[in-house]
Amino acid sequence: GSVLIVLGGTFSAVIASFPLDKLKKMGKHMTKLISGKKYQPEPVIETIIEFAQLARKDGLLVLEERANELEDPFFKKGILLVVDAMEAEKVREILENEVSSMIERHDGEVAIYDKASSYAPAFGMIGTLVGLVNMLKQMNLSEGSSDSLGTSMATALVTTFYGCILANLIFGPISKKLRIRNDEEVIYKQVIIEGVVGIQAGDNPKVLKEKLVSLLHQTSQQKILNGEEGGGGKKEKKSKKEK
């Protein structure tokens, strides 16, 4: 009964709070956490620098064929916009609008688990209150029923425990991990935006690389530095597997 009150109440409140089309994607959220795409900006930086060197040497048009080989649709779109000689401000605007829409979508995903995390303890407390009321109704001190007071109290309070478990061991960590994954994707795409605009502007590849690396977290910056000291890191798989 305690578990049903907490789970049933929490999920009912979530269903009442969000559109059904968003709730249907909760399974995809779990897939994203467990086996979703890993956004690693280090390899894409190497690809951007390679493209910058090609563009400075042979012109932007030479990148069209290479862009069509890219597996990342966002990166591909950015390079093709540059090849089409679109203004730098327009290129940035288009790509940043796409990132803004993505962030809004991600915030909606995280909000589901934030709400569930806040609802679970509340329904745990409701379950406890219901249990206490029932316990008080059944008390009859004249017949010695006070002996079972401890057991009844424990049963009532365990509902609060279940609510805290759901909030702090399930919904809270899911929300946190989704935020981390979402932040990784945002940084990855910000690197692509700055790289694409830098390629179009004809920035010096070394200067451009420093700029892109500065966007990363310190651990990623150190990884790139260690890769350079060790003779260079892996490059992104830029082309699809040849038949």
Regions found by a protein language model. Give the residues of each.
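Large intracellular
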Residues: 1-109, 184-243
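Helix-termination/interfacial motifs at the ends of transmembrane alpha-helices
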Residues: 98-181
